[in-house]
From Swiss-Prot:
Protein name stated in the entry: L-tyrosine:2-oxoglutarate aminotransferase amt1
Record EC number: 2.6.1.5
Biological processes per GO annotation: alpha-amino acid metabolic process; biosynthetic process
UniProt induction comment: Up-regulated upon coincubation of the fungus with the terrestrial bacteria Streptomyces iranensis, Bacillus subtilis or Pseudomonas putida.
Reactions the enzyme catalyzes: L-tyrosine + 2-oxoglutarate = 3-(4-hydroxyphenyl)pyruvate + L-glutamate
Lineage: Eukaryota, Fungi, Dikarya, Basidiomycota, Agaricomycotina
Claim: Transmembrane helix is one of the keywords in the record: no
Family: Belongs to the class-I pyridoxal-phosphate-dependent aminotransferase family.
A Pfam family: Aminotran_1_2
EC supergroup of this enzyme: transferase
Cofactor: pyridoxal 5'-phosphate
Amino acid sequence: MVYFATSAENSKTSYKVDLSHHLSRETRARQPNPIKTIWKIAQTKVGTINMGNGDPHNTLYPISKIDFVVPSLDQPNPVQAWKEGNSKTDIISSYKDESCALSLKTAFAYGTGAGLQQVRGVLADLNNRIHSPPNHTVSLSLGNADSLTKCFRLFGDPGDSFLCEEFTFSPMTNAALPLGIKWEPIKMDKGGLIPADMDKILTNWDERTQGRRPHVLYTVPCSQNPTGSTLPFERRKSIYEIARKWDIIILEDDPYYFLQYGLNVDQFIVEQHGFTRALASVLPRSFLSMDYDGRVVRLDSFSKIVAPGMRLGWVTANNFFAEKLDSLTDSSSQHPHGFGQAFIAELLGDGGWGLDGFMKWTKSLCDEYQRRRDLFMDVFRREVGINGFATAEVPKSGMFVWIKINLEHHARYRVVKESNGDPRTNTAALMDELFRTLLDSGLVLIPASTFAITGSLSPPSGDCILDVSICIDGVGAIAELPLSIFQRVNYFRATFVGTDETICDGLKIFGRTIEQFFCF
């Protein structure tokens, strides 16, 4: 049975929960950008002569037209044809002085923090077809790194603790440290974040000794970075109910959402509802799609499905949070990427691929990445896993394979008992040695210690040389790993999105090197 969360169904439960207490002191103190406030008012007055603006006049822009040459979707496998250089192509154009989806006069001018309505509108339509959230607002961003760091400022005060997976994308968690935000790690298994551990942390939290109970969860639910795990639906439901129980805001950072593998699109649904709805019926249910209260802030990006350098994404939040986020952008990065907005407006508009066409391209992209994943796993089993020194789960989505190094088989692996009876191993030292040996052999894999969250990270206190052999706190100070996670850094993150040659050559190096390492 296929389930669609319809807008009509969700409209029965509008956002009535007061979430204003989650805002940071910075957010509460922020004043609107006064010039942009006047500009917004002026936009509502038809025929008003604007002599108060400070941007160059569009007649002086040194550009009048942009032609985008894109793959034609009128072929069975557009990504494969594009990759092989024999694709049919279409040309979609943006104009300054002629009719198009988004005039370059508008795209290249100063704008509001939320981004241009021509792009926001089509992305709101995409959201409605896939997630059907009630009373939501779409704001554009410069990609998920931009929107996430702004969310840290939106919700975090110095001394706050936020929740996250125990292994996570450290460049983002590090970005919160100078704000005085600390991280409380939640244990994981191959299914991702463990809801029971999240609830245990919140239940046992002592505000007298630990400060304010965490009120924000940062999570990457699909192809979690670095582990590649994807949260099952039942876990998502449990996590959301725990968030409601403890009044938690969920930052749903989901850049890999559209890169799902093994999906079978029902042609009957395509004929009845269109390709986007058909694909939505087999995509994972998002936290946004089950949000009763408006406590989910969802972050999407074009970085993984179009190009990372375009720096364009979108944030979906309740109207109240969206207004505060837009105000922050108005007074910082000003507005999203103009070139990117022009391209996406044309690509997703009536003169381009449209939403259904864009989803067809995304599905074709998934098929290609799935082929590369399967190649990676086949070569891995043959070149690396054959001796049992390393193992890996097959990822269901995204770009990463989380490779476990079975150090217990190494001749120099040691376990000693501490005075309190807890075991301590030399895992970190052996992993550091293997990392450096691989590097000397011409292969870079990212060690698990790079992503480990200790639960004791603190704001910067000084600079020193970083050492990848143990967990880095991201600000220059080397942090001791707690014992529980210290024993579990025997992993590497690898990517399978490179060329076939890169995958094969890299795994051959890995196989030779790890065999020498274990036999030394």
